[in-house]
């Protein structure tokens, strides 16, 4: 029996009122569609989107303007960009998991939904967030 594909908008759980979702983000078009789908499903909820540029294709800047257009969505987006290809002045780009987590922890309570999108293992983002949210 085939049980389906994991990490396609997988609900990891709700912790102290904040639902964490995990999605395997593999292409800018899919990321944009996922953000829009979550906005529709959780209409009226405050959503934090965390996007990690995980693959060489994503982190190498090969998607150009298509990747950067995601930032124009009416949404709160934090980028995890290990190779520093993204450039903006919004202060929402981080180069390490630790820096990203520290930023989220400063104001996570303002959000109802945290959507993690990466084509890498999301455990480095999900587990610290879950643990701290559960503890508070």
Region spans (language model):
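ATP-dependent carboxylate-amine ligase
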Residues: 1-136
């Amino acid at each position: 029996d085939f049980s389906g594909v994991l990490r396609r908008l997988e609900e990891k759980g709700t912790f102290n009122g904040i639902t964490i979702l995990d999605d395997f983000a593999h292409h800018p078009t899919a990321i944009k569609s996922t953000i829009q789908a979550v906005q529709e499903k959780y209409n009226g909820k405050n959503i934090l989107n965390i996007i990690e540029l995980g693959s060489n294709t994503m982190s190498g800047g090969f998607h150009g303007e298509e990747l950067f257009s995601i930032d124009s969505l009416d949404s709160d987006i934090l980028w995890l960009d290990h190779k520093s290809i993204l450039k903006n002045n919004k202060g929402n780009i981080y180069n390490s998991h630790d820096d990203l987590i520290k930023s989220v922890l400063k104001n996570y309570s303002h959000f109802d939904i945290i959507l993690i999108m990466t084509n890498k293992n999301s455990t480095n983002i999900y587990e610290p967030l879950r643990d701290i949210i559960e503890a508070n």
